[in-house]
């Protein structure tokens, strides 16, 4: 799950760069939402992995 979270976080960052660069102005709002969703999922994955005792 951590790999998927990081993958989608990178995709959200790329979408944000493209959206804020003026290439796709409408994608900026969506990129912000996706970025924060997957940032939260990343934190949850790290915390749950730490509680289980597994290394990320």
Curated annotation (Swiss-Prot):
Disulfide bridges in this chain: none
Keyword annotations from UniProtKB, A to Z: Cell membrane, Membrane, Transmembrane, Transmembrane helix
Transmembrane residue ranges: 6-26, 27-47
Main localization category: membrane
Family: Belongs to the UPF0391 family.
Native species: Pseudoalteromonas translucida (strain TAC 125)
GO cellular component, one term: plasma membrane
Classification via NCBIfam families: PRK13682.1-1 (NF010226), PRK13682.1-3 (NF010228), PRK13682.1-4 (NF010229)
HAMAP family reported in the protein's UniProt record: UPF0391
Topological relation to the membrane, as annotated: Multi-pass membrane protein
UniProt-annotated location(s): Cell membrane
Name of this chain's protein: UPF0391 membrane protein PSHAa0537
Keyword Cell inner membrane among record annotations: no
Domain of life where this protein originates: Bacteria
Keyword presence, Transmembrane helix: yes
């Amino acid at each position: 799950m951590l790999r998927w979270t990081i993958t989608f976080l990178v995709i959200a960052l790329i979408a944000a760069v493209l959206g804020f660069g003026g290439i796709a102005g409408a994608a900026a709002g969506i990129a912000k939402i996706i970025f924060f969703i997957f940032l939260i999922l990343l934190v949850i994955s790290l915390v749950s992995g730490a509680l289980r005792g597994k290394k990320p």
